[in-house]
Amino acid sequence: CIRDSVGSEMCIRDREYIDPVRYISNESSGQQGMALIKSLLKKNYRIVCLHGYLQTKLIISPKIKYVFTPNAKSMLAEAKKNSKVDLAIFNAAVADYGIQNYSKQKIKKKSALNLQLKKNPDILKTICSSKQKPKTTIGFAYETNDVFNNAKKKLKTKKCDYLILNFPVDSDPIFNSKYNNGGILNIKGDYIEIGKK
C-alpha cells in the first residue's frame, strides 16, 4: 500500500493476463498486507493501499484509501503518484514477468502452448532510485536458498532502507499461513531475527 502523508504501504499480488481468462501470478493471500495496515492504523497513519487481487477482507477506515492496480505497470504508475510520503512499505507480490503478446480472444486448447514473457518494471528499485523517493522505504524478499546472501544483494540492488526477509521453515512455505518466518535487514548489514510469528 502507499500512504499519502505520514506513512505508505504497497501490498498484494497482481495478475498478468495471457488472455481474458488465463493469467500468471505469484502466491499471496494478502494477510500480511492487512496485518501491516492494522499496525499502521494503531500508530495513526493515513494510508493509501495499492493492491491487486485480494483473498482477504479489507479493513475499512476513513484513514485508508484503496487503489486497485491489476498489474505491475499500473501499480508502478500509482506508486509514482504517491511517492512523497514518510514511509513506503513494498510488500506486493508483483509478478516479475508479464506476457509479451496478450491475446484479446481466449486461446484455444492445443497440445502445447509457448508463451513469450517480458520483464515487468521493478517497482521497488524504481521508486527507491527516484529523486522524489519516500523518506523511509521497506522492501520484502521471499527466499528459498542462500537466503541471507540473496537478501543482502537485493537490499543493495533495490536501494531501500530496510528489507524484510521471509523464508520457509521446516515444511511450512509460509504462504497462506497465519505466520511469517524471517527477520529485518538494514543497509548496514545488521540483521534482527524475528523468527516464526
Where do the model's predicted regions map?
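Glycine-rich N-terminal loop/short-helix segment of MobA-like nucleotidyltransferase
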Residues: R13-E27, Y102-K109
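Hydrophobic/small residue at the entry helix of a nucleotide-binding pocket
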Residues: Q32
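Glycine-rich phosphate/pyrophosphate-binding loop and the adjoining helix
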Residues: R3, V169-K197
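Flexible, glycine-rich phosphate/dinucleotide-binding loops
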Residues: R15-E16, T56, D146, Y191
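Single conserved hydrophobic/aromatic residue that forms the stacking wall/gate
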Residues: C1-G7, I12
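Glycine-rich phosphate/dinucleotide-binding loop and adjoining beta-alpha-beta core of small-molecule
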Residues: A35, L41, R46-P173, G183-L185
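Short pre-catalytic strand/loop immediately N-terminal to key active-site residues, enriched for Gly-Thr
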Residues: Y23-S28, L113-L115, Y191-G195
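Short linear Ser/Thr-Pro motifs
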Residues: S5, S28-S29
